[in-house]
């Protein structure tokens, strides 16, 4: 096997350990920052009543994802399921963040933080997806946790179909 010498001194017959700087340059060359920048995001909820109104005009439920920064299951749900559904089906999907002091106008018009809203819903696990219909009523049971990746999409599709039927 051939070792790659990145130009640093090494003992004969052994590759030099790459410096942090050289490793970063190598990663930059792979285009990883572009992949990180392409991380699909969901709109952050600002006014739930407004988001719900848009969804209902489209005859769709409002999907709210409760997320937590750094949560790998949240990232997987967002990137693999919710962002594509939003992009491809035009669903109204918004994100509310645990441990966030960002202001949010709730369904009644009262202003509180994302954290306060999550507490009022009694959500304790991220990710949790809620499906809202007319009068801000939850249409189906919440989809809580990451589940197994192979089955999450089926659970999400099933809940969405049931929520759509409840709106009809």
Where do the PLM segments sit?
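Thiol-based oxidoreductase modules, predominantly thioredoxin-like and allied folds used
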Residues: 90-111
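Short active-site neighborhood of thiol/selenol oxidoreductases, capturing the structured segment around
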Residues: 59-69
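Non-catalytic, surface beta->alpha helical segment in thiol-disulfide oxidoreductase systems
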Residues: 131-164
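Structural micro-motif
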Residues: 115-130
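Typically the conserved alpha-helix immediately C-terminal to a functionally engaged Cys/Sec
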Residues: 75-88
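A short beta-strand-turn-helix
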Residues: 44-61
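Boundary at the C-terminal end of the N-terminal hydrophobic targeting segment
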Residues: 35-37
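N-terminal secretory signal peptides
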Residues: 1-19, 26-32
